[in-house]
Amino acid sequence: MNRGRSMATPGEQCAGLRVWNQTEQEPAAYHLLSLCFVRAASSWVPPMYLWVLGPIYLLYIHRHGRCYLRMSHLFKTKMVLGLALILLYTFNVAVPLWRIHQGVPQAPELLIHPTVWLTTMSFATFLIHMERRKGVRSSGVLFGYWLLCCILPGINTVQQASAGNFRQEPLHHLATYLCLSLVVAELVLSCLVDQPPFFSEDSQPLNPCPEAEASFPSKAMFWWASGLLWRGYKKLLGPKDLWSLGRENSSEELVSQLEREWRRSCNGLPGHKGHSSVGAPETEAFLQPERSQRGPLLRAIWRVFRSTFLLGTLSLVISDAFRFAVPKLLSLFLEFMGDRNSSAWTGWLLAVLMFAAACLQTLFEQQHMYRAKVLQMRLRTAITGLVYRKVLVLSSGSRKSSAAGDVVNLVSVDIQRLAESIIYLNGLWLLFLWIFVCFVYLWQLLGPSALTAVAVFLSLLPLNFFITKKRGFHQEEQMRQKASRARLTSSMLRTVRTIKSHGWEHAFLERLLHIRGQELSALKTSTLLFSVSLVSFQVSTFLVALVVFAVHTLVAEDNAMDAEKAFVTLTVLSILNKAQAFLPFSVHCIVQARVSFDRLAAFLCLEEVDPNGMIASNSRRSSKDRISVHNGTFAWSQESPPCLHGINLTVPQGCLLAVVGPVGAGKSSLLSALLGELLKVEGSVSIEGSVAYVPQEAWVQNTSVVENVCFRQELDLPWLQKVLDACALGSDVASFPAGVHTPIGEQGMNLSGGQKQRLSLARAVYKKAAIYLLDDPLAALDAHVSQQVFKQVIGPSGLLQGTTRILVTHTLHVLPQADRILVLANGTIAEMGSYQDLLQRNGALVGLLDGARQPAGTHDAATSDDLGGFPGGGRPTCRPDRPRPTEAAPVKGRSTSEVQMEASLDDPEATGLTAEEDSVRYGRVKTTIYLSYLRAVGTPLCTYTLFLFLCQQVASFSQGYWLSLWADDPVVDGRQMHAALRGWVFGLLGCLQAIGLFASMAAVFLGGARASGLLFRSLLWDVARSPIGFFERTPVGNLLNRFSKETDTVDVDIPDKLRSLLTYAFGLLEVGLAVTMATPLAIVAILPLMVLYAGFQSLYVATSCQLRRLESARYSSVCSHMAETFQGSLVVRAFRAQASFTAQHDALMDENQRVSFPKLVADRWLATNLELLGNGLVFVAATCAVLSKAHLSAGLVGFSVSAALQVTQTLQWVVRSWTDLENSMVAVERVQDYARIPKEAPWRLPTCAAQPLWPCGGQIEFRDFGLRHRPELPLAVQGVSLKIHAGEKVGIVGRTGAGKSSLAWGLLRLQEAAEGNIWIDGVPITHVGLHTLRSRITIIPQDPVLFPGSLRMNLDLLQEHTDEGIWAALETVQLKAFVTSLPGQLQYECAGQGDDLSVGQKQLLCLARALLRKTQILILDEATASVDPGTEMQMQAALERWFTQCTVLLIAHRLRSVMDCARVLVMDEGQVAESGSPAQLLAQKGLFYRLAHESGLA
């Protein structure tokens, strides 16, 4: 009979239908595979593959096609090769037809096979053409087809040639080789990428992601990312090295899609009217939602991301199919090893199939993980953008129900939890399928004995849930202590000036360390329970196996234990164990994600600003009225009562309307109503023209001065200079280190309160708006600056003349210059008219003026512009040799400051920055950091831990080896003689492993807790001992990051990563030992694999560490921008800057994604390549076993191969654990950063020059005293020599930046003297410890400070006084009745920093605290500047009663406060300009007289 005529045509007819034909005699010993099997597979598998997937693929590219590709040389070559294959197969079809026509009988298969291949090749060529039409540059379907066409027919061709079948027909021989060559060429070409489309929709980015240019094999194994990993290995990665973000991953695209679907889902909600209208009660509305609102958000997310999720799910299902194929193949392989008569080709085939199944499982699983991680990234981006856009439209009522920290918590915690849950969603149903398949496998292997596995498995589940519940209780306790510690640490760092001024560091350190001790105690208990949980997970496979083996061997009739039963059971139980551990974890993560999802949905449903609350127009109509309110009634939210009633108001063009009234009258609410921020109950509001708004509490961004003022408008340099000079900022900016490019820090930390308010005013003025709404912008300015700003900006001749201005003010002396005055009382308009008209009416305005009880022109609520100036208090930025101008006239021509500003604009880096940026670490972590951590753990404990890990791994190895010996025991009459002994020893080894595992893990966690405690104590001590200048240069956020995030990393992450690294590393050694012991020949292949492993590890670790650090830094900027926008959303809306802020947020998110995407790709690159290496180790173990079959037992082979099967995960987790550990070790490095900074003087001196009762008199003497706030700055105080007598009351006055507060700082040694010294009662203060000095002086600052804790703790931090003494002090400051009315009285818990108390009440409590100290020296640093006149009178009365015999230094802006002082010091440019009694200084008509004249006192 004629032989086959095609590449797939059989060389001879098969004997029957069995492809595993063992009756057919093999032609030669070197034939490894059954010819019948190979012929069948090569004939039908490739065509079936393409006809199943081809139509689906064709439909997909038809729906998702892009622009067609160029007719490139690659495409032409593919088509030519395809047509050549069609011609060859046409020839193969024609030959049998011609022979039939000639009367030569032909077997049907000789015609069917070539015909099938002809149609299949035609279809493949058609797909090549359609791919070009639809823009497909690399095809996975065709790559798989050509690969199958190469492998299966290739094997058939080799066997046909080796059997000599081609010698009979040379022509067929040549045709077959030609076909195979063409297919190989097609395979090679499918590994290449075609040219980009003709008309690309997207512009080409600078550094495009190479994924688009990658071939299918490169995409499957993530080789396209190798370039970035190589760059990261060779050098430090920078922003230019990161790939540009594709449009499909950009914030603009993702957020717009989700927002569109979210609005669509919300349209169906009852009561929805185009914007969210869910009420916002005055509670944590979105933290504890009363009803679930997740439905619309869930539908929106599903519509946007379902295709990506479903494709990833399909990859996971296929991966699991191959996962369960491996145990079946292992079973067949061990059966082959146990059968000495089996053919060699069976072993080779099974080894190849195990390797192929493991590789396919790896590739599909990693594709699932890749898509899941990309989906996580996209979901996080989309929901974060949705939350940000919601922040920009939140109503005032909704904002009151939340805080910036809550929103940041949504972004950093809840969105992260929701994104992470994507991976676990499929676990809710797929794990049950795992469990079912595992039990089916066990039943096939062990029969009814497998039911015991069910019993043990079910009994372990309650144990895990119990441990999880108990651990959760201790974790909650740890979180409570951590929250308490965080609150106290934050309060301590934000009020460090007050703490150091009073010498309270020890008290706070003791409180913090006590809380820290409780936190670590809960952490230790939690980690010990975690160790038990981990041991139960690790040992559960052993427990189930022990019970199953014992029942099977001791109860069942056929109780022989062989290698197949033993090691296949262990492999299946390993899969079952993963399901057992993963299931509760998945449920826990999904439950947490559900809570977070509810919080997010509730937040997104909060009440928004009513778009119909105000009718705004930029058109200029004929009406002269810019603002019109008709019968307006407004409320903060739907639940709250109206705050404004019956408002009827019209403001014409160019009018200056002053709004006054008592506290709580509704002045700020009126401005909010005009801005559309309040809920309009009835009436109408109309505004014609653009609006600029200045809030009462200045809001500034963490950017430069020029960016704050320009506020996303084009830079107009002359106008900018004019605005800065008019707002009294010109000289300030000129003295800043980097001029207008000087960063002002987080929340304006580098500026004083007055500077921030003037910057806020400058921002509004720069806009050139038609309407200005000014909410008491003069309150934070001293009298002189207030007058200057009003005259040059707000007043009739200021920059805003001709615009419509509504000025809310408590500065009553400006009222005569207002065009109209509106007096509010209890939310209604009491009266309105000109100043003279209202005086004649003798109404509400006259009552306000009489109630002020101060001369006209006195500033009523000024706050110090001196404390906290840039960069530290005392305004060091104003140089002493530059006199501060008393009036800033409009600039003509090019002034010096304008030239300086222009120079700074040209070179923003010329003078450097002031605040210390939180640095991003680059490169590898130094060895010294690891050694410092290990020293904190303790050398003995480290050695003991390594010994325990070694012992438990020896027990694990012995357990597997003993099981192999058990499986190899001879079977006599269906039984093994020593089965009982084998079982007892197997159980004993498992118990020893469990004990060693628990002990080793507990040692790691307890050692980590010990190291964390020591490192935290060291960090706390280093920060507490730092001088005040360190806190002025270092943002509070940086410090809090060390005490929160970095400390948490040291607490939890480092011990866990170290435990993981040691576990996997020792496990990897066990696998290597098992494989080499069973087949020593494997060492030849293992060594090259280890070289590749080391190479992958080096590339990954170097790059991943850098990417993770960059990602952390980028994401923190997103959170900071979110919090900043939340705090200033009212200003953003008033300036109509929502679009630019949204664009900035999207840009920040995109920058974060530019780091996140390479990071997740690098993770997949590592996992794929290391798992493929692990699969290679399995293949090596199996092939070596086949080669050494003659002298290897099945039990030893099972031990070796089953151990190798577990190494695929172990390889990548060793590297990941090492990388995670290195990333976490950065926290140790950052925690130790502050150990090297200079420390302040000792708190206590062993030989102190002061007596126990020092100072007994209170005499203070300055001798040539000079002080500078930073080494590079000029002297803020210089050449001060004066003596203050005991018991003398001295006032200290001067303009802003004159050095008033600097004298107090020098007296308390908050800043050390640059020259000279200060003596108190004849003792130099440098000879006294800081705490000794500061505890003997009392200072009452301008800003009252309270701390989290009870009222009693706030009054007596050192616990030195009795309750009776505290009540007496409270009675003196007239707060006894108030405190008595509080719940708990002295034990009343203050919220935050006394947020539930008024400013006046907090200041009186600070005064009571000062009374309890009973020191001889008292410093009042503008202590009454921010309180109302009534509170000021109370404070003055208490001071006169308690401090009559004390030396009092009264620092004041308001000269009225120092008129009763015995002596007044007038500071000017850091020197004492004048000194004498108030009457003498007024008579001299010098600087004091000019200040008094400006304040209306002379």
UniProtKB/Swiss-Prot annotation:
<feature type="transmembrane region" description="Helical; Name=5">
    <location>
        <begin position="174"/>
        <end position="194"/>
    </location>
</feature>
<feature type="glycosylation site" description="N-linked (GlcNAc...) asparagine">
    <location>
        <position position="341"/>
    </location>
</feature>
<feature type="topological domain" description="Extracellular">
    <location>
        <begin position="446"/>
        <end position="448"/>
    </location>
</feature>
<feature type="topological domain" description="Extracellular">
    <location>
        <begin position="156"/>
        <end position="173"/>
    </location>
</feature>
<dbReference type="GO" id="GO:0006855">
    <property type="term" value="P:xenobiotic transmembrane transport"/>
</dbReference>
<dbReference type="InterPro" id="IPR017871">
    <property type="entry name" value="ABC_transporter-like_CS"/>
</dbReference>
<feature type="topological domain" description="Extracellular">
    <location>
        <begin position="100"/>
        <end position="104"/>
    </location>
</feature>
<keyword id="KW-0067">ATP-binding</keyword>
<feature type="transmembrane region" description="Helical; Name=4">
    <location>
        <begin position="138"/>
        <end position="155"/>
    </location>
</feature>
<dbReference type="GO" id="GO:0030643">
    <property type="term" value="P:intracellular phosphate ion homeostasis"/>
</dbReference>
<dbReference type="GO" id="GO:0032026">
    <property type="term" value="P:response to magnesium ion"/>
</dbReference>
<keyword id="KW-0325">Glycoprotein</keyword>
<feature type="topological domain" description="Extracellular">
    <location>
        <begin position="956"/>
        <end position="992"/>
    </location>
</feature>
<dbReference type="GO" id="GO:0016887">
    <property type="term" value="F:ATP hydrolysis activity"/>
</dbReference>
<feature type="transmembrane region" description="Helical; Name=1">
    <location>
        <begin position="38"/>
        <end position="58"/>
    </location>
</feature>
<dbReference type="Pfam" id="PF00005">
    <property type="entry name" value="ABC_tran"/>
</dbReference>
<keyword id="KW-0597">Phosphoprotein</keyword>
<dbReference type="GO" id="GO:0055062">
    <property type="term" value="P:phosphate ion homeostasis"/>
</dbReference>
<dbReference type="GO" id="GO:0016324">
    <property type="term" value="C:apical plasma membrane"/>
</dbReference>
<feature type="transmembrane region" description="Helical; Name=8">
    <location>
        <begin position="425"/>
        <end position="445"/>
    </location>
</feature>
<feature type="topological domain" description="Cytoplasmic">
    <location>
        <begin position="59"/>
        <end position="78"/>
    </location>
</feature>
<feature type="transmembrane region" description="Helical; Name=11">
    <location>
        <begin position="575"/>
        <end position="595"/>
    </location>
</feature>
<dbReference type="InterPro" id="IPR027417">
    <property type="entry name" value="P-loop_NTPase"/>
</dbReference>
<keyword id="KW-0472">Membrane</keyword>
<feature type="topological domain" description="Cytoplasmic">
    <location>
        <begin position="369"/>
        <end position="424"/>
    </location>
</feature>
<feature type="domain" description="ABC transporter 1">
    <location>
        <begin position="627"/>
        <end position="851"/>
    </location>
</feature>
<dbReference type="GO" id="GO:0016328">
    <property type="term" value="C:lateral plasma membrane"/>
</dbReference>
<dbReference type="InterPro" id="IPR003439">
    <property type="entry name" value="ABC_transporter-like_ATP-bd"/>
</dbReference>
<dbReference type="Pfam" id="PF24357">
    <property type="entry name" value="TMD0_ABC"/>
</dbReference>
<comment type="similarity">
    <text>Belongs to the ABC transporter superfamily. ABCC family. Conjugate transporter (TC 3.A.1.208) subfamily.</text>
</comment>
<feature type="transmembrane region" description="Helical; Name=9">
    <location>
        <begin position="449"/>
        <end position="469"/>
    </location>
</feature>
<feature type="domain" description="ABC transporter 2">
    <location>
        <begin position="1260"/>
        <end position="1494"/>
    </location>
</feature>
<feature type="topological domain" description="Cytoplasmic">
    <location>
        <begin position="126"/>
        <end position="137"/>
    </location>
</feature>
<dbReference type="InterPro" id="IPR050173">
    <property type="entry name" value="ABC_transporter_C-like"/>
</dbReference>
<keyword id="KW-1278">Translocase</keyword>
<keyword id="KW-0812">Transmembrane</keyword>
<feature type="glycosylation site" description="N-linked (GlcNAc...) asparagine">
    <location>
        <position position="21"/>
    </location>
</feature>
<keyword id="KW-0677">Repeat</keyword>
<comment type="function">
    <text>Mediates the release of nucleoside triphosphates, predominantly ATP, into the circulation, where it is rapidly converted into AMP and the mineralization inhibitor inorganic pyrophosphate (PPi) by the ecto-enzyme ectonucleotide pyrophosphatase phosphodiesterase 1 (ENPP1), therefore playing a role in PPi homeostasis.</text>
</comment>
<comment type="function">
    <text>ATP-dependent transporter of the ATP-binding cassette (ABC) family that actively extrudes physiological compounds, and xenobiotics from cells. Mediates ATP-dependent transport of glutathione conjugates such as leukotriene-c4 (LTC4) and N-ethylmaleimide S-glutathione (NEM-GS) (in vitro), and an anionic cyclopentapeptide endothelin antagonist, BQ-123. May contribute to regulate the transport of organic compounds in testes across the blood-testis-barrier.</text>
</comment>
<feature type="topological domain" description="Cytoplasmic">
    <location>
        <begin position="470"/>
        <end position="531"/>
    </location>
</feature>
<feature type="topological domain" description="Cytoplasmic">
    <location>
        <begin position="1100"/>
        <end position="1170"/>
    </location>
</feature>
